[in-house]
Regions:
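Short, internal strand/loop/helix patches
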Residues: 174, 223-225, 240-280, 286
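Flexible helix-coil transition and linker loops at the boundaries of alpha-helical arrays
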Residues: 53-62, 93-110
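N-proximal helix/coil linker or "cap" segments that precede and/or mark the start of modular domains
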Residues: 130-173, 184-187, 251
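Conserved helix-turn-beta segment immediately C-terminal to the redox Cys motif
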Residues: 189-190, 205-229
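Conserved redox-active cysteine motifs that mediate thiol-disulfide chemistry
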Residues: 195-212, 233
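Thiol-/selenol-based redox modules, centered on thioredoxin-like
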Residues: 280, 284-314
């Protein structure tokens, strides 16, 4: 069983919760904490969480997931001391449970540990210790390789470490449409990499934005590449082998959502792991020297992307 090795925060005593106190309400507490985090209601979230807390020898995964949402909410509000406190509780409680059960044996434990590590890393960076943050996430990436949180950890590692570094070469197992440009063909170009999924509505909304950018800036040297991967299913969640999914992408999917002729689409699972794509779309902007200038999980508007691209074209 993988154990996290580098975490050492002696100032915080672990606060634990009774499983009996959470019977029938844990899942609803997780949902409530999530809603409050996104709403920016940090003080209310803390009051709700602490009102449910009682002493026990062992936390439940559900409780720790709720704690991790408290940490995320505090980080959204940039209340870093509070974020560190609850992220540490989520991590240390998760590590205690990992002595007795695998990480992916149920759905709440990966949420608790993954979010705890994410928040703690960004807290360290916000407090001015980026090296500590990168080391934390690098060790976690190694320790939890092959688990459901691997890509999430990689995403947050790259958020803190990829910008300003050379863009790694993509793998191409298969491709859609025209052959993707080779590394040599991309030299001297400004390249926007658009990591997407066929099931992703945000990706479909992003495509017209990319089309507009291509039309505006292609003659100045902008290239757009759209990596994707096999997901194991086709329309409506129907299970599919890679061969069946590729046929679907080239057939029924392309008939409804044509693959743009201006965007090469390499297909490889390793690209999504290597670039930490747990959010689709993920956008990576690379300058003419092959250096990453922006790593952005999530979509961006035409105006936001144009403001990033135009200085690189000068």
């Amino acid at each position: 069983m993988k154990q996290f090795k580098v975490l050492a925060i002696p100032f915080l005593l672990i606060c634990l919760v009774s499983p009996l106190a959470l019977v029938g309400q844990s899942s609803s507490l997780v949902s409530e904490m999530s809603d409050l985090a996104w709403a920016g209601e940090v003080d209310r979230a803390r009051a709700v969480l602490e009102a449910r807390r009682v002493d026990s020898e062992q936390p439940t995964p559900e409780w720790l997931a709720a704690v991790s949402w408290m940490a995320r909410g505090a980080s959204f509000a940039e209340r870093w001391n509070l974020a560190e406190q609850y992220a540490t509780e989520a991590i240390e409680g998760s590590l205690a449970l990992l002595k007795e059960q695998p990480l992916d044996s149920e759905r709440f434990l990966p949420t608790a540990l993954g979010a705890g590590l994410e928040v703690l890393g960004h807290t360290y960076a916000a407090q001015g210790d980026r090296a500590r943050a990168v080391n934390l996430l690098r060790a976690a990436r190694r320790d939890y390789a092959g688990t459901s949180i691997e890509t999430r950890i990689q995403k947050n590692f790259l958020l803190l470490s990829l910008e300003g570094r050379p863009f790694p070469v993509l793998e191409i197992d298969h491709y859609l449409g025209s052959p993707p440009p080779t590394p040599d063909e991309l030299k001297g170009k400004v390249v926007l990499f658009f990591f997407w999924a066929h099931w992703c509505p945000d990706c479909k909304r992003q495509e017209p934005v990319l089309r507009g950018l291509y039309e505006a800036y292609n003659d100045q040297g902008l290239v757009i590449v759209g990596p994707t991967q096999y997901w194991g299913y086709t329309s409506r969640g129907q299970n599919a082998t890679p061969e069946e999914e590729l046929a679907y992408l080239k057939g029924d999917y392309a008939a409804q959502f044509p693959i743009p002729s201006w965007m090469g689409v390499p297909i490889s699972t390793n690209n999504f792991l290597n670039f930490g794509v747990s959010t689709t779309p993920t956008l990576v902007l690379v300058d003419r020297d092959g250096i990453v200038q922006r790593y952005n999980p999530g979509d961006l508007s035409h105006e936001e992307l144009a403001a990033l691209i135009e200085p690189l074209l000068e």
